[in-house]
From Swiss-Prot:
Alphabetical keyword list: ATP-binding, Coenzyme A biosynthesis, Cytoplasm, Kinase, Nucleotide-binding, Transferase
GO cellular component terms, A-Z: cytoplasm
Protein name: Dephospho-CoA kinase
InterPro entries noted in UniProt: Depp_CoAkinase, P-loop_NTPase
Annotated function: Catalyzes the phosphorylation of the 3'-hydroxyl group of dephosphocoenzyme A to form coenzyme A.
Amino acid sequence: MSRLLRLGITGGIACGKSVVAGYLQRQYGVPIVDADVLARQVVAVGTPIYQAIVDRYGDGICRRDGTLDRSRLGEIVFAQPQERQWLEAQIHPAVVAEMEQAMATCDQPLMALVIPLLFEAHLEGLVDHIWVVATPPEQQLARLQQRDRLSAHAAGQRLASQLPLEEKIRRADTVLWNTGSLEELYRQVDQAFSLLGRGGKGG
């Protein structure tokens, strides 16, 4: 069996990483592992990490149904870098373990890993090729405010918590610019996908 090619998809918040991954899955049948989905699973009610979070912040961090109030948690961790570091130290190892398990059991030649904090968490070694999905800062801020219903201040805090997009672009193997229509973004994905496995880089 040939070695699994591991594609990492990252980029700034609200730049379109999930859109790119969804297209890869629909158009090419590429299996997708999304770190954000895994992060929600590892903090589900009853998990050790869930309990650690409740122990640290109290029952007020939970909704009425017992699940974590992600908005409230976000307010805390994005305003206090040390709290964000603590939370990431709980979640990241569990998410990486889940991704490694998914890769170990994958029977396809290619798997895409959507990892928003790929560079920040120093996970470059987990993948063979890195796509960065990018959009201009003002467009990114507007999308984030609309998507997550955030104030400009709260959205700015979230953007400031990540590595600058310019640095992610510098470290990318391929850059996909999400600045126009979906069709234009998909054309870039098609071109980048055609180069995978050939050692090709684009963008």
